[in-house]
């Protein structure tokens, strides 16, 4: 079984989603089940309904799970196993206060040594009112594991001291809950961010202490950098999956991009299901990869092109395939649904005919064309059915030509002074002329 284990303490970012996608693909390739484990052990930081938001996003991306568990439902089992380790002298109570430990950290810093917990401190403050935590005994030998991306990773015994597995309130720490739940659900392979590399030997230590000898596979993904080259932070809008969706990027385009980041793919544009045939986690680059919004925009445009007109219309909140066709036409100059919606909204909004951004004024010409168009629409003039016939009839009736004809006509039809060729767009606009040709008051 493979798993994706999000925490309901914040928004899902693209690094989380990338890990979820890779775990899901590998589960499909190996015909294994896919587990979602909500890691809600940090009770103070859990955000109400954030778990539902995460699950809705996973569902939207088509990452359908076979099992769903909440880590908190296993708290009693975690406590039982902590007591088991204590009974075997593989874990112990520690009564050290936060102040005592902080003083030891400062000592180590002054001596320019790495801080390492000393088990002999455990009962120094036992007579005080300090509630004890439970610590697992540190490693007695080096711990190594194979990483599908980074190769063999080795941690010396002195790097893995006696760390906390149960807090003073009896809540398990992240590493303890994670290690036990991976055992309980028979997880075989874990794909996660490289910020978890230092957690892996600790989780292996817990497995060994509990007599769990299954060797898990690991792949730690390199971080994603912002366009500036620095690590992406929560302040980077593009790091948020919700923001990308709100901007009008399709789930299938986002997945396409995240799978191809730092990877060799047989084609530029593909769907999630295509990746089942060729994806190999070992091909993911070891070094950090820079987020490229231009690349994502390109892929989004390509995935929008793959939609039929009815599908496109539904994404634009319309049931009329002509609106979908209009949207597809705008892919010549737009890449996201928001950009296309904006252009179509301008078409159907009352038109402002005052001076435009270039300082040009076609107010008189717009009024002349508006009056003629209004008459043609009301009389169901047959010349409206074909662009060339329509253009010639309107030009003859208005006595306007050149720039003084085409720019005001474009303003009346699209609300803009530049854009697609009117001959391309008119076949789709003609069905809506009564709604389109309106002036703002």
Swiss-Prot record:
UniProt-annotated binding residues for ATP: 234
Superkingdom, taxonomy of origin = Bacteria
The broad enzyme category this protein falls into is ligase
* The keyword Ligase is assigned to this record: yes
The sequence motif named 'KMSKS' region is recorded at 231-235
- Is S-adenosyl-L-methionine given among the entry's keywords? no
Q: So what EC number does this one have? A: 6.1.1.17
Q: Name one GO cellular component term.
A: cytosol
Reaction catalysed by this chain? tRNA(Glu) + L-glutamate + ATP = L-glutamyl-tRNA(Glu) + AMP + diphosphate
Q: Which SUPFAM superfamilies match?
A: An anticodon-binding domain of class I aminoacyl-tRNA synthetases, Nucleotidylyl transferase
Chain positions of motif 'HIGH' region: 6-16
**Could you tell me the keywords of this UniProt record?**
Aminoacyl-tRNA synthetase, ATP-binding, Cytoplasm, Ligase, Nucleotide-binding, Protein biosynthesis
> What InterPro entries does UniProt report for this protein, alphabetically?
aa-tRNA-synth_I_cd-bd (IPR045462), aa-tRNA-synth_I_codon-bd_sub2 (IPR020751), aa-tRNA-synth_I_CS (IPR001412), aa_tRNA-synth_I_cd-bd_sf (IPR008925), Glu-tRNA-ligase_bac/mito (IPR004527), Glu/Gln-tRNA-synth (IPR000924), Glu/Gln-tRNA-synth_Ib_cat-dom (IPR020058), GluQ/Sye (IPR049940)
Q: Which GO terms describe its biological process?
A: glutamyl-tRNA aminoacylation
What GO molecular functions are on record for this protein?
ATP binding; glutamate-tRNA ligase activity; tRNA binding
Cell compartment(s), UniProt: Cytoplasm
Q: Gene3D superfamilies from the entry? A: 1.10.10.350, HUPs
Assembly, in brief, is: Monomer.
- Tell me, what does this protein do in biology? Catalyzes the attachment of glutamate to tRNA(Glu) in a two-step reaction: glutamate is first activated by ATP to form Glu-AMP and then transferred to the acceptor end of tRNA(Glu).
Q: Which family does it belong to?
A: Belongs to the class-I aminoacyl-tRNA synthetase family. Glutamate--tRNA ligase type 1 subfamily.
Q: Which NCBIfam families match?
A: gltX_bact
Instruction: Name the chain's protein.
Output: Glutamate--tRNA ligase 2
Q: What is the lineage of its organism?
A: Bacteria, Pseudomonadati, Campylobacterota, Epsilonproteobacteria, Campylobacterales
């Amino acid at each position: 079984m493979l798993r994706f284990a999000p925490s309901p303490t914040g928004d899902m970012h693209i690094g989380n989603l990338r890990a979820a996608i890779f775990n899901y693909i590998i589960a499909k390739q190996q015909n294994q089940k896919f587990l979602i484990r909500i890691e809600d052990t940090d009770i103070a930081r859990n955000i109400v309904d954030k778990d539902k938001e995460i699950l809705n996003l996973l569902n939207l991306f088509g990452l359908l799970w076979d099992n769903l568990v909440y880590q908190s439902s296993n708290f009693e089992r975690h406590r039982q196993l902590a007591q088991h380790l204590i009974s075997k002298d593989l874990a112990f109570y520690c009564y050290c206060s936060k102040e005592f430990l902080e003083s030891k950290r400062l000592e180590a810093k002054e001596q320019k040594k790495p801080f390492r917990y000393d088990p002999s401190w455990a009962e120094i403050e036992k007579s005080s009112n300090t509630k004890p935590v439970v610590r697992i005994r540190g490693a007695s030998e080096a711990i190594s594991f194979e990483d599908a991306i980074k190769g063999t990773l080795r941690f010396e015994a002195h790097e893995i001291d006696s760390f906390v597995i149960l807090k003073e309130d009896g809540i398990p720490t992240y590493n303890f809950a994670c290690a036990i739940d991976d055992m309980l659900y028979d997880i075989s392979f874990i794909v996660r961010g490289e910020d978890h590399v230092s957690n892996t030997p600790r989780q292996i230590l817990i497995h060994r202490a509990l007599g769990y000898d299954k060797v898990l596979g690991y792949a730690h993904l390199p971080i994603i950098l912002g366009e500036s080259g620095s690590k992406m932070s929560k302040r980077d809008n593009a790091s948020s999956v919700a923001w990308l969706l709100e901007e009008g990027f399709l789930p299938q385009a986002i997945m396409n991009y995240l799978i191809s980041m730092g990877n060799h793919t047989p084609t530029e544009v593909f769907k999630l299901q295509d990746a089942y045939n060729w994806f190999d986690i070992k091909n993911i680059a070891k070094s950090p990869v820079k987020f490229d919004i231009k690349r994502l925009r390109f892929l989004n445009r390509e995935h929008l092109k793959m939609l039929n007109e009815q599908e496109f219309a539904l994404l634009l909140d319309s049931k009329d395939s002509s609106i979908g066709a209009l949207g597809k036409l705008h892919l010549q100059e737009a890449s996201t649904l928001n950009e296309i919606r904006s252009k179509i909204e301008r078409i159907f909004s009352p038109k402002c005919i005052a001076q435009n951004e270039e300082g040009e004024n076609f107010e008189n010409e717009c009024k002349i064309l508006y009056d003629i168009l209004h008459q043609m629409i009301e009389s169901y003039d047959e010349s409206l059915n074909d662009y060339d016939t329509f253009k010639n009839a309107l030009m003859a009736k208005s006595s306007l030509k050149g720039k003084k004809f085409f720019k005001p006509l474009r303003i009346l039809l699209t609300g803009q002074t530049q854009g697609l060729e009117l001959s391309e767009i008119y076949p789709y606009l003609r069905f809506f002329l009564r709604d389109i040709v309106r002036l703002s008051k």
